[in-house]
Amino acid sequence: YVVDFSGHTIEAVNKALKELKKQGMKSLVLDLRFNPGGLLTGAVDMAKLFMGDKQMIVYTKGRKKDFYQEFKTNAKAPYPDVPMVVLVNQGSASASEIVSGALQDNKRAVVAGQRSFGKASVQQVLPLSGGAGLRLTIAKYYTPAGRLIQRNYRDKSKADEGGIFPDIEVEVDPEQEIKVFMQYNKVVYTPGKKAQLPEMTEKDPVLDKAVLYLTGKLTLEQAQKEAAEAKAAKEAAKTKKAASKKETQGKKT
């Protein structure tokens, strides 16, 4: 469970991975849910842990050619073959999306959860008089396959663009999701104490799906079929509720 991409993130992740390897790690779940992002270098270094040499991680593109920049791996990864699932949700942004998008496009990991936030732009601050400044977006980040990560929040006609879409979509009640992460955060944010997993009293359907997939008890096709059926059932229930409400209002008039 990675809470952000700060200056110490990669060091901590490396330490955890080495310990897991000693314990005989056979597969890995990288949890980036509610991770708001952070340093670009952290995202690039994270991807390098799992990807092959000379693979594209992310690139930037703007109106000027000068704003085009590629970020690639430059060495063999220490964990290139361990089966992986990356967990994301609407709270996963920026560096989280760069990592999940890179691993997904390079077919290095399966992504599970909900569509990510959609925030990945390169900004430049132009100084103004009086100590003020103007923050200007000069470029945007794209996944290796050319997908724009930044979501367009103004143009509703482009609502399907931006963010990282999971391979395995799992709908979760927002309140339930917060309860799950309150338990996880007891481990992460308890200074001075040895990290121990608390008794998990709350169900985590996204993690459950990831484990089923990694243990071979659920195929990607089965997971996608279940997600489509759940979505259709939800839409049908929504339509039925709307029709019932309309009928009730009609009787009252």
Where are these regions (language model features)?
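C-terminal "post-core" interaction segments
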Residues: 1-253
